[in-house]
Regions:
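Extracytosolic secretory-pathway proteins
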Residues: 1-32, 41-43, 49-166
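Ser/Thr/Gly/Pro-rich low-complexity, disordered linker/stalk segments of secreted
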Residues: 162-176
C-alpha cells in the first residue's frame, strides 16, 4: 500500500519481507476439520494490518484482516476473514471505522480436486485467484480492483486419519 506500513501477527508471515511489493504470504493453520475426502476447512490465527496514504495523524487506508478461514471443496478454494477498516472517503480524509465478518477475501480454482487421505496432502491453484467479493474491495478503499492482487496459492495439510465413508441414506423396506 502506497506510503504505508504492514504488520503480520500469529501464523502469518511474509516470505519476501525484503520486497513487500512482491509479498508472498505463508499462513500456518492452527486447526482444521473435514467432513469428506474432498472438503476441508482450515483456521489461521493471526492478523494482517495494512495502513496507507497517511494524512496528519491518520491513514486513509487502515485495515486489519483476522480470523482467517480457508475453505476447500472439490476444486474450489475460498479464503474468508473478518475485517476492521476505515471507509474510504477521499485521499485526504480518514473515514469512519467499519467492520465486516467473514467476507470472502479471495477465491481460486485448484489444478486438481482436493483428495484427502492420511498423511501430507498438497494442493495448488490453477494460476492466480481473484478477489472474492465487493466487501474486500471496499475494505481496500476501492483502490485495488483487478485480479492481479491475488496471486496463485499452494499449500499442504497433514491429515491425521482417513475420512470415514459417507453414510448410506437408502433405507431398507420394513416388514410391517
Amino acid at each position: 500500500i502506497a506510503q504505508g506500513t504492514s504488520e503480520l501477527t500469529g501464523g502469518i508471515t511474509n516470505l519476501n519481507e525484503a520486497n513487500k511489493a512482491q509479498s508472498n504470504y505463508k499462513f500456518v493453520a492452527s486447526k482444521g476439520a473435514s467432513t469428506s475426502a474432498n472438503q476441508a476447512e482450515l483456521n489461521v490465527d493471526g492478523t494482517m494490518h495494512y495502513q496507507g496514504h497517511k494524512h496528519g495523524d491518520n491513514y486513509v487506508l487502515d485495515n486489519t484482516f483476522s480470523n482467517f478461514n480457508l475453505k476447500v471443496e472439490g476444486s474450489k478454494l475460498e479464503l474468508y476473514a473478518d475485517v476492521h477498516y476505515r471507509k474510504y472517503v477521499d485521499n485526504n480524509t480518514a473515514g469512519e471505522w467499519q467492520d465486516a465478518k467473514q467476507i470472502k477475501v479471495s477465491e481460486w480454482t485448484l489444478k486438481q480436486p482436493l483428495a484427502l487421505k492420511a498423511g501430507d496432502v498438497a494442493f495448488a491453484s490453477n494460476g492466480q485467484g481473484k478477489f472474492g467479493s465487493q466487501d474486500v474491495i471496499s475494505a481496500l478503499g476501492d483502490f485495488y480492483k483487478d485480479d492481479v492482487h491475488t496471486g496463485a496459492i499452494t499449500g499442504k495439510v497433514k491429515v491425521s486419519r482417513e475420512c470415514p465413508p459417507v453414510p448410506s441414506t437408502s433405507a431398507k423396506p420394513s416388514s410391517e
